[in-house]
């Protein structure tokens, strides 16, 4: 996530927006239907280039969803020229923040009167940053053994459909459960790939 944010000129602190959106769970799903690390709704995901259908749901694809989030954040920044307003718009929507900035005639988005959830949103991002950057200050004592080790993986480019993902997984020396755990955007036991995307 961090290299993709950097590559797109998005401030590194926006990784904490992802933390509060999904608790860094790539398979997170809200009761409203938002999904993945960045909690895209289906329509917004499609608007920002993600494939969402019964076979594939790229909202669960860590890299592609992060790139889509960067496009969203850059679009919002082009409107507001203010990263705090951008963060608030991720929660409230770009149209709502734009209308409130105009209606309330304020120069600083922190001065906006917003619904409680959105008003707290930016501060939740800042709180997550503080916790991650100084855990011992808040009573968290983490040892290296408490952390998840990096998971070894092999990246494979697929440009056509796969009729049987279980057989495909076996041919790569793993099973279907591991394949789908590492690729939660795969929704079925086959991959049609009608779009020809990689």
For the regions a language model picked out, list residue spans one by one.
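Export/targeting segments at the very N-terminus of extracytoplasmic proteins
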Residues: 1-23
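Alpha-helix N-capping/helix-start residues
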Residues: 11-12, 42, 176
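Solvent-exposed coil/turn segments that connect beta secondary-structure elements
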Residues: 22-23, 43-45, 130
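Alpha-helical scaffolds flanking conserved acidic
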Residues: 11-18, 35, 83-88
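Extracytoplasmic and endomembrane cell-envelope/extracellular-matrix remodeling and assembly machinery
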Residues: 1-2, 7-8, 47, 52-55, ...
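Short, surface-exposed glycine/acidic/tryptophan-bearing loops
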Residues: 27-49
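A general structural motif at alpha-helix termini
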Residues: 18-21, 41, 90, 182-183
